[in-house]
UniProtKB/Swiss-Prot annotation:
Database matches in PANTHER family: HEAT SHOCK PROTEIN 90 FAMILY MEMBER (PTHR11528)
Main subcellular localisation: cytoplasm
Database matches in InterPro entries: HATPase_C_sf, Heat_shock_protein_90_CS, HSP90_C, Hsp90_fam, Hsp90_N, Ribosomal_Su5_D2-typ_SF
Protein name per its UniProtKB record: Chaperone protein HtpG
Keyword Aminoacyl-tRNA synthetase: no
Region listing for A, in residue ranges: 1-331
Source organism (scientific name): Wolinella succinogenes (strain ATCC 29543 / DSM 1740 / CCUG 13145 / JCM 31913 / LMG 7466 / NCTC 11488 / FDC 602W)
Length: 618
């Protein structure tokens, strides 16, 4: 017998399960049946691809036994089974990044934490909501040894060798007194039909029935056990689709929409894709796994292939079932398979069309974009084939709509007469951008400016130069300035302020690229802008946060722009005290940086200079 200690995250999860206040405890059975179905699908695939298992004879099925008196519930399957190391990995640690994300959200407040269970499938551990002891007996297909895993969910578990005739897994739950309803026929039937009716393997419920004063053992297949996606959509109800989504995704929320398509002709395949209503915790993790399963002629092949859909649609849940791929197709072949590439391209277009359809309902789409907009934006970076469609789906805050995001089409429809470009400003958040000095001239002209205020915008939006026939221009760029040449700085002004510019460049040497006059300001004395060939400030900040020290390149220096019409700038021109002029130069630069990014690198220096200036003024 080997005693093991649970990983810390597992202990946290178990503590939540054991003391759970979550009312919908019946989901534990959905989770266990789903795991059993996964085990059967894995074995089905291996019997086609693994030489050692090709001749394996077995009947794929899930069996459920119960004993009302003893309060014992037993679930078994004829799937792949586990060996000792599988038991440690699957039941003793948390390998799934999503589960780790779930655990990291736990607050210690039992009521709040229990509510999280409904937003996330917690797999095997959900059984501890209803059981105070669990015994798992398992044998891996193709191996001789069998093992028993036992735990009461109190920090450790035991693994011991045991005997088991055939491959597969049996899970025995010793139910808590108050959960004995889960050892009754009517309750189990109800739960199976509610959550697992469309599991593609038969689920048999075993019970005893009195006949002529004799106890007679019976078994009854409770679920329909058919591939829902293969049924004509005309024969399916809305409720059928919703139930199947929940069993497929472990999501307790209803999906927002779905697309069910059967394609016939030179290629034959069926797809069923769902748009979830809530984003999973780990959607933006590097190791996030796709939610789409690939089948060939109803045989499960993989759910871990990044070639099934583009990565920006990784939030989509669903099924691809092909008639043309070979059953023993390998993952390496999948990556270069023309049939799958065609399915991927057609599926992407269908999903985007459904999202476009969803966008007709403004309220629904606002909620959807809040959850998945960031992922969709990633498509602008790599999916050039669908770039125009994706642009129609984008939503942004703006100077006229700081609280509600708008489409590019909405912006276009309310452009000022004679306006020939879409103007934007990039930064950290809409509140900061709304108060940017760079907006002043545009507000005066009543020209709307889009806010690219998410981290992802600084990467993807520079790739978007055009919307229809309209160019996109950053308002701090020379390109945007050319649109208003009638307000450019005169030669006379340049000559008049030349001494001040030289003095500032000397005082700020090493901190800026240059100092110049600008007509883009109205009420502010100064602002900072990036040189045209340099990355924008938002991108610089994001790269710094990601730990990327901008590669081998030094951090780009900003350009300081002064407003020649501002009284303060005029007074600085007349100031003869070099030390004070230097302090003012630094203060103006710091103030401009603060308004641009909301933070300063040298806050202490800024405070000292500000205090010195106040001291002189008092």
């Amino acid at each position: 017998m080997a005693k093991h200690t649970f990983q810390t995250e597992v202990n946290q999860l178990l503590d939540l399960m054991i003391h759970s206040l979550y009312s919908n405890k019946e989901i534990f059975l959905r989770e266990l049946i789903s795991n059993a179905s996964d085990a059967l699908e894995k074995l089905q695939y291996l019997t086609l691809t693994d030489e050692n298992l090709k001749n394996l004879q077995y009947t794929p099925r899930i069996d459920i036994h119960f004993d009302e008196e003893k309060k014992i519930l037993t679930l078994s399957d004829t799937g792949i089974g586990m060996n000792e190391s599988d038991l440690v990995e699957n039941l003793g640690t948390i390998a799934k990044s999503g589960t780790k994300s779930f655990v990291s959200r736990l607050s210690g407040d039992k009521k709040k934490d229990s509510a999280l269970i409904g937003q996330f499938g917690v797999g095997f551990y959900a059984a501890f909501m209803v059981a105070d002891k669990i015994v798992v007996t398992t044998k891996k297909a193709g191996e001789e040894s069998a093992y028993a895993w036992l735990s009461e969910g109190k920090g450790d578990y035991e693994i011991t060798p045991c005997s088991k005739e055939s491959h597969g897994t049996e899970i025995k739950l010793f139910l808590k007194e108050e959960e004995k309803e889960f050892a009754s026929r009517w309750r189990l039937e109800e739960i199976i039909k509610k959550y697992s009716d469309h599991i593609p393997f038969p689920i048999f419920l075993h019970y005893t029935q009195k006949k002529n004063d004799q106890e007679e053992s019976k078994e009854e297949q409770v679920n329909k056990a058919f591939a829902l996606w293969r049924i004509s959509k005309n024969e399916l109800k809305e409720e059928d689709y919703k139930e199947f989504y929940k069993s497929l995704s472990h999501d307790s929320h209803d999906p927002l929409a779905w697309v069910h398509i059967k394609v016939e002709g030179s290629q034959e395949y069926t797809t069923l894709f769902y748009l979830p209503s809530k984003a999973p915790f780990d959607l933006y993790r590097v190791d996030y796994r796709s939610g789409v399963k690939l089948y060939v002629k109803r045989v499960f092949i993989t759910d871990d292939d990044k070639e099934l859909l583009p990565s920006y649609l990784r939030f989509v849940r669903g099924i691809i079932d092909s008639e043309d791929l070979p059953l023993n197709v390998s993952r390496e072949i999948l990556q270069q398979n023309r049939i799958l590439a065609n399915i991927k391209s057609a599926s992407t277009k269908k999903i985007l069309a459904e999202i476009e359809n969803l966008a007709k309902d403004e309220e629904k789409y606002e909620a959807f974009f809040k959850e998945f907009g960031r992922a969709l934006k990633e498509g602008l970076y790599g999916d050039f084939e669908n770039k125009e469609k994706l642009l129609e789906l984008m939503r942004f805050h703006s100077s006229l709509s700081p609280n509600k995001k708008i489409s590019l089409q909405s912006y276009k429809e309310r452009m000022k007469e004679g306006q020939k470009a879409i103007y934007y400003l990039m930064g950290e958040n809409a509140d900061l951008l709304q108060n940017s000095p760079l907006l002043e001239k545009f507000k005066k002209r009543e020209i709307e400016v889009l806010f690219f205020d998410e981290e992802i915008d600084s990467i993807v939006m520079p790739m978007v130069n055009q919307y229809g026939d309209l160019p996109l221009k950053a308002i701090n760029s020379a390109e945007a300035d050319k649109d208003f040449e009638e307000e450019s700085v005169s030669e006379e002004e340049k000559e008049r302020f030349k001494p001040l510019l030289e003095r500032f460049e000397k005082a700020l040497s090493g901190e800026i690229k240059s100092v110049r006059l600008s007509k883009r300001l109205v009420d502010s004395p100064a602002c900072v802008v990036a040189d045209e060939d340099d990355p924008n400030f938002a991108m610089i900040k994001m790269m710094r946060q990601m730990g990327n020290a901008l590669g081998d390149f030094p951090e780009p220096k900003p350009i300081l722009e002064l407003n020649p019409e501002h009284p303060m700038v005029g007074k600085l021109l007349a100031l003869e005290d070099e030390e004070r002029a230097s302090d003012y130069a630094h203060l103006l630069l710091d103030q401009a940086k603060l308004l641009e990014s909301g933070s300063l690198k040298d806050a202490v220096g800024f405070a000292k200079r500000l205090n010195a200036m106040l001291e002189r003024a008092i």
